[in-house]
């Protein structure tokens, strides 16, 4: 009866991989740490595993695909184009009309456009060292190192402040000497913003926003210093210029104004009517240098990138094509089209669409739902409060760490510390590496446990004494198996991981023949161990020595086998051992600890072992080495069969 109880306990201990939960937790924790070092902060742990399944990344254009460093490049006023020089937020630059430098202070129409952009604004231009006294900057000559200029607020508005500063508008008057009487803030639905100021001639409203929206609200247009009626022909001309500027990748805003009587409560509703159009302003937001490469990397990994932006369709298409995100055959859809589309029609179009322009948060939600209906695993970026529903609906919601709101970050599974699209691709890459590593140590631990179970089961079936006692099995599962398994979680990314298609989300961990590998390789380890036990028992007739030989043979077979688990896609000879020094260290420590369990007198009493002699080690090395060689043979046979099967299918 005692022998039967021991057999049952030993089989139970052998069947349960005690170290597996701890190793899974360590793998996920290390993965989160690695992602954090690459600026991807994981807020919800399941996202780590889901990242490896992502098939579509829906990314905002501004700040994620581009630098979010707006610079005014062009004005269109009174039928003329005015170029603006300068880079970034430094308030130095010139104004050129037909290639000739002009002083904006002498151009009343241009100055009004600059003034509207400058004062219809909440952003602040600052330096990262002591601020200098504000003064006209048009003629300022730079001496010495250029100061670092920064924008506090929205970069689009910041670009308009910089343009005004280039023309000599005094920075110190903003927000102090000339405070607005009232503000009608920007809203994604309205696509415009208005600020009302009190000037010497009374109240004046300055308005900026999407050209198609502002033009529809204008009844007049400023031409050659006179206000003319806004005719249908003028509307078409302005919108044509808007399309031209947008097709060059510029973000275009329309600038307008109107004089107001004294305001009463309900008068605010009519402020943004009967406006006078002053002109258009085009701003450049250069793409991030690393994004083009990251988009190509994602494409090679079977991950499609979709641009979602509030900008004009032509602006979005220009940027998308410059990044290699959209080709000639790809669809681009604007928000107005989305409004008129049924869900079924959107379902048809979304598969071939790479760009969505002039979208609002409700559109984002519909796009995510349509992509998910096609079976895609969707990652969606967002920064505003209204983006939270779309982020929650996505499989991986991604918030912006620099520009995002607290509400969006709370709803997201991941936060980008640098607001960079390349970080999303890096996180997908890490997600695949983590999943690969989880499969590696599951393969290792379960094959080792299968070998232990088979050893015990065969001995019981054929009537042999128990080859292993429970304490020996626990020692292997928790110590000599556990350390190499943890080291496998630190394996670097397979260079070919991003050339494979995303795995199916419902794909089990034992897919792609992993279960068969575990079973076959567990059989090999088990046969080696039981053979070592039988040979030692037959030669010496000492049960304790035979158990020690079987115990040590099993440990050595497992320590050899761990190197076979480093890759499912490469042979052992193709993997560089030096890329995971932790594994080498773990194997060395596990081997040393096994020697202590065999030779240390105190440990011998605990683990029921005896000191082994040279002949015992010959048996151990021959059989554990044979198991390693046989694993290689089995793997080669499996690859050959797989290759021939694929050729036959073709």
Residue spans of the language-model regions?
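Conserved cytosolic headpiece of P-type ATPases
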Residues: 1-502, 509-510, 523, 534-537, ...
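Hydrophobic, aromatic-rich cap/lid helix
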Residues: 277, 559, 565
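Generic alpha-helical transmembrane segments
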Residues: 480, 525-526, 548-562
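Membrane interfacial helix-start motif at the N-side
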Residues: 514-515
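Helical transmembrane-bundle signal
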Residues: 522-525, 529, 558-561, 590-594
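Membrane-helix interface and helix-disruption motif detector
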Residues: 539-545
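Active/binding-pocket-proximal capping segment
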Residues: 546, 566-569
């Amino acid at each position: 009866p005692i022998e039967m109880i021991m057999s049952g306990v030993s089989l139970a201990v052998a069947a349960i991989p005690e170290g597996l939960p701890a190793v899974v937790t360590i793998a996920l924790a290390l993965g989160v740490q690695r992602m954090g070092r690459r600026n991807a902060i994981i807020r919800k742990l399941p996202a780590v595993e889901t990242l490896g399944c992502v098939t579509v990344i829906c990314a905002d254009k501004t700040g994620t695909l581009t630098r979010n460093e707006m610079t005014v490049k062009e004005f269109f006023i009174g039928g003329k184009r005015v170029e603006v020089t300068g880079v970034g937020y430094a308030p130095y630059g010139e104004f050129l009309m037909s290639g000739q430098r002009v002083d904006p202070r002498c151009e009343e129409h241009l100055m009004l456009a600059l003034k509207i952009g400058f004062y219809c604004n909440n952003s602040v231009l600052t330096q990262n060292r002591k601020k200098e006294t504000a003064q006209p900057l048009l003629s300022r000559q730079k001496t010495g190192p250029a100061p670092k200029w920064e924008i506090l607020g929205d970069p689009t508005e910041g670009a308009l402040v910089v343009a005004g500063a280039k023309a000599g508008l005094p920075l110190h008057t903003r927000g102090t000497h000339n405070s607005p009487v009232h503000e009608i803030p920007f809203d994604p639905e309205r696509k415009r913003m208005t600020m009302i100021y009190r000037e010497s001639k009374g109240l004046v409203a300055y308005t900026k926003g999407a050209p198609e929206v502002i033009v529809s609200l204008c009844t007049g247009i400023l031409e050659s210093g006179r206000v003319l009626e806004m005719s249908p022909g003028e509307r078409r001309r302005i919108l044509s210029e808007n399309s031209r500027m947008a097709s060059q990748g510029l973000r275009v805003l329309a600038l307008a104004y109107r004089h107001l009587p004294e305001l009463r409560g309900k008068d605010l509703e009519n402020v943004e009517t009967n406006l006078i159009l002053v002109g258009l302003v085009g701003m450049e937001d250069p793409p991030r240098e690393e994004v083009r490469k990251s988009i190509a990397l994602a494409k090679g990994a079977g991950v499609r990138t979709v641009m979602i932006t509030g900008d004009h369709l032509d602006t979005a298409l220009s940027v998308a094509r410059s990044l290699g995100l959209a080709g000639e055959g790809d669809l681009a859809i604007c928000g107005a089209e989305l409004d008129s589309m049924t869900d079924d029609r959107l379902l048809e179009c979304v598969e071939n669409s790479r760009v969505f322009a002039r979208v609002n948060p409700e559109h984002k939600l519909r796009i995510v739902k349509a992509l998910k209906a096609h079976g895609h695993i969707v990652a969606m970026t967002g920064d505003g409060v209204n983006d939270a529903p779309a982020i929650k609906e996505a499989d991986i919601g991604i918030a912006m760490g620099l520009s995002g709101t607290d509400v969006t970050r709370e709803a997201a599974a991941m936060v980008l510390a640098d607001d960079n699209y390349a970080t999303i691709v890096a996180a997908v890459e890490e997600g695949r590496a983590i999943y690969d590593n989880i499969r590696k140590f599951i393969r290792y631990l379960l094959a080792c446990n299968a070998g232990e179970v088979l050893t015990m089961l065969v001995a019981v079936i054929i009537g042999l004494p128990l080859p292993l006692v429970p304490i020996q099995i626990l020692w292997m599962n928790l110590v000599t198996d556990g350390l190499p398994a943890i080291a496998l979680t630190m394996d670097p990314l397979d260079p070919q991981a991003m050339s494979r298609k995303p795995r199916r989300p419902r794909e089990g961990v034992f897919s792609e023949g992993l279960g068969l590998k575990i079973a076959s390789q567990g059989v090999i380890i088990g046969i080696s161990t039981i053979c070592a036990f039988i040979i030692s028992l037959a030669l010496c007739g000492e049960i304790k020595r035979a158990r020690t030989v079987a115990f040590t043979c099993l440990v050595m077979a497992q320590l050899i086998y761990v190197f076979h688990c480093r890759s499912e896609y490469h042979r052992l000879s193709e993997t560089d051992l030096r890329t995971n020094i932790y594994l080498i260290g773990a194997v060395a420590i596990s081997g040393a600890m096994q020697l202590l369990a065999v030779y240390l007198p105190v440990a011998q009493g605990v683990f029921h072992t005896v000191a082994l002699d040279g002949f015992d080690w010959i048996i151990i090395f021959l059989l554990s080495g044979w198991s390693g060689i046989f694993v290689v043979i089995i793997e080669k046979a499996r690859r050959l069969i797989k290759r021939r099967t694929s050729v036959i299918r073709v």
